[in-house]
Amino acid sequence: MDTLTSSPLVSDLPGIAADILARVRGKSPRVHCLTNAVAQNFTANVLLAAGAVPSMTVAPDEIAQFVARADALLINLGTLDRERRQAATTAVEAATTKQRPWVLDPVFVDRSRQRAEFARRMMSMTPQVLRLNGVEFAAIAQAEPAQDALDRYARDQCCVVALTGATDAVTDGGRKLKIENGAALMGQVTAMGCAGTALVTACLAVEKDSWLAASAALLAFAVAGECAAARARGPGSMAVEILDALAGLDREILLTRARVR
């Protein structure tokens, strides 16, 4: 695993994102995804389009073995049944033992007290990146998703917070940036956010600077979404077009289209 630069400027991000994406394609990192049943197929296809190698088992009795052979781990709480609860804890313990980075996506954490409590237990195991939306942040952090709250939570939890929405925000409590790329049509495709988190995980597998990895992945995914939306006729074709856009994403496209501040 490499680090591109210790003190990048926000303006450097498009080029850095291109370099990290090239490393994903060159190294084909294995990403184990404990994700929700709705998201599995699309998530796997997004990872393949980016150049990573996905695995998806949720079986508690074998997930530790899969994680041990992976380069990074994604924990997505979308379908939080009993088997996935057990598997999530086992998977994170295995990742910690093997010093593999992992990402938490606390989907629908705002919908039930039990889910919020489980997500907070997962946070106590210190993911490298927490990727979520504003409503989910308010539920898990018990604070509104203003920049100062994001920064404070990132510092307190010793992780990167990657907040996605109309504008994405990424902070490690010190460094911060906002990404203004993306397309409304992305929100009309099931599992789009979940798949974006998987791309964060793939980038984290090849880049040990968690803030850079998360920032690069969200920028790449948002730009790919814009390119896909320009060609799509609706949600159905959007789901296909973003795979092609991600597979064809290059440095020139990122440098030309990125809107980062």
Task: Indicate residue ranges for each PLM-predicted region.
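Glycine-rich phosphate/adenosyl-contacting loop at the front of the ribokinase-like
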Residues: 1-53
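Short, well-structured alpha-helical segments that form the helix of a local strand-helix-strand
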Residues: 149-154, 210-225, 242-243
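Charged C-terminal helix
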Residues: 12-15, 223-261
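Conserved phosphate/ATP/ADP-binding segment of small-molecule kinases
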Residues: 113-185
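Hydrophobic beta-strand scaffold residues
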Residues: 54, 99-103, 161
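Glycine/small-residue-rich loop that forms an oxyanion/phosphate-binding "nest" at active or ligand-binding sites
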Residues: 76, 83-132
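Active-site cofactor/substrate anionic-group-binding motifs, chiefly glycine-
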Residues: 46-98
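Short, small-residue alpha-helix embedded
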Residues: 139, 188-219
